[in-house]
Every structure is written in structure tokens, then in C-alpha cells.
């Protein structure tokens, strides 16, 4: 309701950790949803039954919106979980490799997506549009945004603003490969600041 506890705290937006269907082989391997295996479906792990995942996620979004709270979801488009369908479909097309043909590991997960490839760009864009158009998600936080790169992130902003001009976008500006260029500051993206984080930790 509009008098919900979160609203009474002054909260006007919430961010959900990854809720796209993820790899969950055993409780011991739990990783908070950061091993996606389907970019187009809400995780059945959070639903009362697999068949109701989309319906119940829609109800969740509607409830937050009714209370005046925007919903941002954390998305992971830099690597893939197990089973790795993209690896099995076309390893060289979807996954990044080095000069010896080995999978690169700048995500720390062993199978970076090749975000410069047009099919990967289309997959990411189609997925994001799906979440906005079908679930009315208000924004996205991009895990290890550096691996998506400036070009793809800029295209994401352009395409999503055509659908929802007030879309909220922010990203981690780093990966184990490096950092996003300073020109990201001229885009509509907000960026996580590791410097602010470390400064805060130093005084807590």
C-alpha cells in the first residue's frame, strides 16, 4: 500500500540483486544470482512455483509502483552460468577468447561474454527491452560494466530511453581488465565509486 514501511522510511527506489534465472546447482554453490542462465526469465527459485515466476514478479513490481517506489534490477551480462547455453551454441561468437583461443576471465568467472559482437549486443538489448516492456522495470544496475564497454552501454542508454525516457542506469565502472573511460561521465549513467566506498570504510 502507499503507507508501506519502506515508503515511510523515505525510500523511493529499491534495487534487487539479480533475479534473472540463475545457476543454483546446490546450496553450497549459492552466489546471490550472479551466474545467469536465462536473460529473459525471472528466477523460478524466488517463485511459489516455476510456472508462476513471471506472474509473481509482475505482482511484486505492481505493488512497489502502487507505493510510489521504483524498481531497479541488477543485471549480469558479462559472463554466463552453468549450463552455458551460449558456449554450446557458438563458442567463438558469444564468448571472448585470447590469441590462443582460450576463454578470457576478466570477470573472474571464467567465461566472459564477447560484448563487442553484434549478436551479443542484440541479445543484451533485446533482454533489457523485454524487462522494461513486459515487467515495467524502472532501471538497471550493470555488474562489471567495463566488460560491456562504452559503445554497448551508450547504445543501451539510447535504445532504452526511446521506450522509457526516465530509465535509471548505473554501472560498476571496472572489471579485472580495467576501467570504463572518463567519457562515461558525459552519459546518462551513474557509476559506482570504489574511492567513495573505501573512504567510507576507512572511517566506519
Map each language-model feature to its residues.
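Short, well-ordered coil/turn segments that N-cap beta-strands
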Residues: 10-12, 67-69, 74, 136-138, ...
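Glycine- and acidic
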Residues: 113, 137-142
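Catalytic domains of carbohydrate-active enzymes, especially glycoside hydrolases
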Residues: 2-25, 134
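Active-site-proximal helices and loops of the catalytic beta/alpha 8
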Residues: 34, 127, 144-204
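Surface-exposed amphipathic alpha-helices with a cationic face
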Residues: 4-7, 58-67, 157-162
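Short, solvent-exposed turn/loop segments enriched in Gly/Ser/Thr/Pro and often Arg
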Residues: 16-26, 75-84, 144-149, 172-176
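Conserved, mostly hydrophobic/aromatic
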Residues: 6, 16, 39, 64, ...
